[in-house]
């Protein structure tokens, strides 16, 4: 019993410290220093309603919108609870079939020429909110037709929403699809 008392006391102390005090302090610091990020990097529409996060991809399938990367999450697309890649290699027959079906769907939607890989391959998490500028540009004719807009106006919108490499050398230029589509709705509903 003598050895049990200090063990129980330490359990209680560390439970309070690690389960209560530490998370409260870290959350407080995050709220003070990075308030937007601490709340999930939420995006609001023109009416101020929260419509998504800059960190998680959203499904868009209509011809009036730019389409995101395919989702790799099971059951239904863009499910954060099921985040994770398929782990299928580039020679996997099921993977090749899926990519082939995606290419056919893009061709059927009117995309001509070279198709950027990020329009047919899911990201490692399956929830990537970004596409490359090239992936947005190949969609311009479809979106322009569906919205009755000029290709030039869409090109300018894409350029305005292209994020550069982080610190000038990390990653590739990218476009957040949700932010681009919200701007598109604001410009021409």
UniProtKB/Swiss-Prot annotation:
It is found in: Cell inner membrane. GO terms for cellular component: plasma membrane. Its main location: membrane. InterPro entries: KdpC (IPR003820). It is a single-pass membrane protein. Keywords: ATP-binding, Cell inner membrane, Cell membrane, Ion transport, Membrane, Nucleotide-binding, Potassium, Potassium transport, Transmembrane, Transmembrane helix, Transport. Belongs to the KdpC family. The system is composed of three essential subunits: KdpA, KdpB and KdpC. Part of the high-affinity ATP-driven potassium transport (or Kdp) system, which catalyzes the hydrolysis of ATP coupled with the electrogenic transport of potassium into the cytoplasm. This subunit acts as a catalytic chaperone that increases the ATP-binding affinity of the ATP-hydrolyzing subunit KdpB by the formation of a transient KdpB/KdpC/ATP ternary complex. PANTHER family: POTASSIUM-TRANSPORTING ATPASE C CHAIN (PTHR30042), POTASSIUM-TRANSPORTING ATPASE KDPC SUBUNIT (PTHR30042:SF2). HAMAP family: KdpC (MF_00276). This is Potassium-transporting ATPase KdpC subunit. It comes from Geobacter sulfurreducens (strain ATCC 51573 / DSM 12127 / PCA).
């Amino acid at each position: 019993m003598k050895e049990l008392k200090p063990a129980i006391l330490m359990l209680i102390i560390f439970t309070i410290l690690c389960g209560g005090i530490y998370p409260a302090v870290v959350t407080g610091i995050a709220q003070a220093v990075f308030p937007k990020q601490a709340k999930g990097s939420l995006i609001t529409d023109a009416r101020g309603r929260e419509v998504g996060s800059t960190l998680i991809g959203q499904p868009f399938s209509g011809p009036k919108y730019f389409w995101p990367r395919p989702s790799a999450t099971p059951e239904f697309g863009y499910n954060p609870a099921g985040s994770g890649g398929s782990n299928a290699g580039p020679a996997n027959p099921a993977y090749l079939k899926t990519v082939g079906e995606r290419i056919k769907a893009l061709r059927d939607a009117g995309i001509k020429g070279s198709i950027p890989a990020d329009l047919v391959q899911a990201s490692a998490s399956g929830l990537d909110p970004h596409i490359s500028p090239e992936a947005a540009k190949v969609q311009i004719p479809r979106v322009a037709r569906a919205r009755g807009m000029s290709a030039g106006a869409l090109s300018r919108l894409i350029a305005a929403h292209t994020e550069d490499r982080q610190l000038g050398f990390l990653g590739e230029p990218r476009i957040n699809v949700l932010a681009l589509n919200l701007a598109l709705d604001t410009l021409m509903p």
